[in-house]
Amino acid sequence: MDSPDDRSNKPKSSSNTGGMRNVTALGLVSFFTDFSTEMVLGVLPFFIITTLGATRALLGAIEGSAELVSHAFRMVSGSLSDKTGKRKVFVVTGYAVSTASKPFFAASASWVDAFLVRAGDRVGKGIRTAPRDALIADSVSESRVGRAFGLHRTIDQLGAIVGPVAAFALLQIVDIRGVFLASLIPGAIAVLVLVFFVKEIVVKKKERMPFFGNIVALTRGNRPLLLLLIITGIFSLGAFNFSFVLIRASELGVQESMIPLVYAAINISHTAIGIPSGIAADRIGKEKMLVIGFGIFLASSVLMISMSGNALYAYLLAAVFGLYAGVSETVQRAVIPRYVASELRGTAFGLYYLVVGVCFFVSNVLFGFLWDVYGLSAAVTYSSIVSVIAISAMLVFIRKIVPQYAK
């Protein structure tokens, strides 16, 4: 097995100052993309259920399937970016596909149409995500990677705040389909920023080998990475999508026209915790922060059933769920580079996202089914039990594995 130092080596072309400028530029790309995406997602669950007539189980299947498609493409694009030594071409392609897809929600006449559009959007996300994360990790030293992902996530989430607020404002003058069409504008700006301001970081090309050769090279003898993927997969088997939080908010009495503001509350909380969680991860350990993220999710699961009778509770639930998303999404990405050499990071991020995608698909379908058939309490009980298992496993990982990689 490679030594810890070998697995965390950096491309010689990156520097902290220039690298953080690249991270900031990528953050701006994500800002405008999330502006576009969250305009759509703030109203999409109700469009699918109320306008198109889907059930909660179908909503879970749509979201889970779309994410599965996305995560599968991340494996392919991540591996290809390692083989070619190029990240940016995949990032540009992915953002362009997503931007072009979302306006077609306006033409959806059934939940099948909505699923196809959602899948197209997620294909774009799948193409770009692993190479983009590898580009972020390649841009800075390993000691600053938590800050880099925290900064990127925070700028990203500022767009996720603006998007639902913009959707709320637009709903005062146009219908939901008009919101879908308007999402094209910020998405196009994102692609332009990416093309003109994000720089490629030169990395060592991986020697030519069959497609799955990268996976073999990545995982051979790398027990820590395999264990980390297993633990993350277990947690993802219990995690549920934000869409269920919005449906629960409606049950708590939030009017449909106000739901985008509940979604904005998720994203405000998500944004506020991004940079602090990245800095804390660099200081106390990324694996410890991951446990904290899992614990916050467990708390949000309990809040799904412990609050009722007051619409204001929905905003508290949204805020706690946003904290979980901010910590988890920042730290789960930041922990990978410690165990992987730079020329295999695209593959590593792709494999990570594939594991998460498959497990998240199962979780969302099962959560929606349990809620429809047995009630919300059964669905939350399932999520909570799985979360406790993942937390326990991560604590063992911290005690047994992390000390071998401590710097």
Predicted regions and their residues:
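C-terminal membrane-cytosol helix-exit motif in multi-pass small-molecule transporters
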Residues: L184-K205, A393-I398
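Cytoplasmic membrane-interface "Motif A"-like loop-to-helix N-cap segments
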Residues: K83-Y95, R283-F294
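Helix-loop junctions at membrane interfaces in 12-TM secondary transporters
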Residues: A106-R118, S306-L317
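Helix-loop boundary and gating motifs at the non-cytosolic
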Residues: S13-L68, P224-V262
